[in-house]
Each structure stands twice: as C-alpha cells, then as structure tokens.
Amino acid sequence: VTNEDLSKIVETSDEWISSRSGIKERRVAKEENTTSLAILAGKRALENAGVTAEEIEVIIVATCTPDYFFPNTACQVQEAIGAKHAVAFDLSAACSGFLFALSTAQAYIKGGIYQLSEQKRCQK
C-alpha cells in the first residue's frame, strides 16, 4: 500500500507521510496475522542464533496490533517455539515499540536479570 493509495482514502499526501516518517509503502500479509508472523520470527531467530528454545529466558513482542488481548502474543510465541522457561510479555508503544522492546531487553541483561546465551555458555 503506497502513500498515494492512502491519500485516496484519508486526507494526506505522499509528501506529508514521507517527510515525517520516511515511509513510502507498506505490505499487507493476507494469509498471516501478528501471531503467525511473530512465531515465524521466533523460529528464525532461534535458528539464526543457534540456540534452543529452552535457553530463552525472555520473549518480548512489540506490537500495537495483537490478534488477542489474552493470551498475549508473546505467550503464544512462547508456546509455539517451546520456550517453556521464558518470561513472555507484549509491549505496546506504536511506532517506537521496537526501540522500547530493545531497550527493555538491554536493561534486563545489563541488570543481570537475564543473560545472553553466550554469557550462559561461558559460565558452564
């Protein structure tokens, strides 16, 4: 969906959106939803990081478009990937959600609440 497409249904313009957000177009996932996309991302993250689901201590999903309010999306990801020891919660902060989720995870790690997989492996 382009900015031009949006300007046909709401009072805006490509220039207005682009200058304020840098966004030119969006994708629509017709067969997917927030939960299925988050589960896929979780599985890919495990594979790319080379860790098991049992090693995961926390799952933070940043979204303002959950499929359900209960159970939250993070808990659905937790179950689907088998991260039975993880704390799981959603964080809703609209466009800045990713930054808030990342800084929350960083604070947990820095504070010693959770560890990076590499840190845990070095302690064994």
Task: For each feature predicted by the language model, list its residue ranges.
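A short, small-residue-rich loop immediately preceding and capping a beta-strand
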Residues: E57-V61, V87, Q115-Q123
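Active-site-adjacent elements of ketosynthase-type condensing enzymes
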Residues: L6-T12, P66-Q76, R121-K124
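Conserved "HGTGT" condensation-loop signature of ketosynthase/thiolase-family condensing enzymes
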Residues: V1-I60, A80-I81
